[in-house]
């Protein structure tokens, strides 16, 4: 909704977090949730409720919303690239479902990357944990051993995971393609600073 009406989700999160009944700790915009807990636990709760003929409509809607999140992000990527994906060099920085883990279970990139490949994109990624087993069988996917190599020839750089390693990258110095774009799925950068550097920057919810 914020993207539709040109409102910054970070401002909304700060405002909501001021309510002590809500708090701001978990109000972070981003891709779909994943890992070993949320996906399994939400489904287990719904299944248990069904056995006792109880309809947990809110939790069901959360599960469905999370399923749709990756497809919405994919549409955003297509929009950023003006629908021209074939032969575009797209770099994913981070592929785990969150930072400080090597867990890729239900990571949104597991849906996005194969979809982009089908559309002809050339995918490259860097993952601080060195994780690459999931993509070994995919064509047009390469793994870089460092950030500089990963991003230097990119048309689009996607910040998929909020690793601290990614927060101080000098994109202007490293990326050769002067018309490169950044899609920050974790909002780890200041949009104002990016615009000041004349970088084509796109964030979640803004």
Identify the residue ranges that each predicted region occupies.
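Structural/interface elements that position substrates and couple domains in central-metabolism enzymes
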Residues: 1-206
């Amino acid at each position: 909704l914020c993207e539709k009406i040109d409102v910054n989700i970070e401002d909304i999160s700060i405002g909501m977090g001021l309510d002590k009944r809500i708090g701001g700790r978990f109000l972070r915009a981003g891709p779909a949730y994943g890992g070993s807990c949320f996906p399994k636990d939400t489904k287990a709760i719904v299944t248990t409720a069904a056995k006792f003929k109880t309809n947990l409509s809110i939790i069901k809607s959360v599960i469905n919303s999370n399923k749709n999140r990756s497809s919405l992000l994919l549409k955003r990527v297509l929009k950023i690239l003006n629908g021209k994906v074939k032969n575009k060099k797209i770099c994913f920085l981070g592929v785990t479902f969150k930072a400080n883990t090597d867990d890729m279970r239900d990571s949104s990139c597991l849906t996005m990357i194969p979809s982009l490949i089908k559309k002809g994109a050339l995918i490259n990624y860097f993952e601080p944990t060195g994780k690459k087993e999931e993509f070994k069988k995919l064509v047009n996917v390469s793994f870089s051993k460092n950030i500089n190599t990963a991003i230097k020839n990119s048309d689009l750089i996607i910040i998929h995971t909020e690793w601290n390693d990614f927060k101080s990258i000098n994109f202007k110095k490293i990326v050769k393609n002067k018309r490169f774009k950044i899609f920050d799925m974790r909002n780890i950068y200041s949009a104002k600073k990016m615009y000041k550097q004349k970088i084509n920057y796109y964030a979640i919810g803004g």
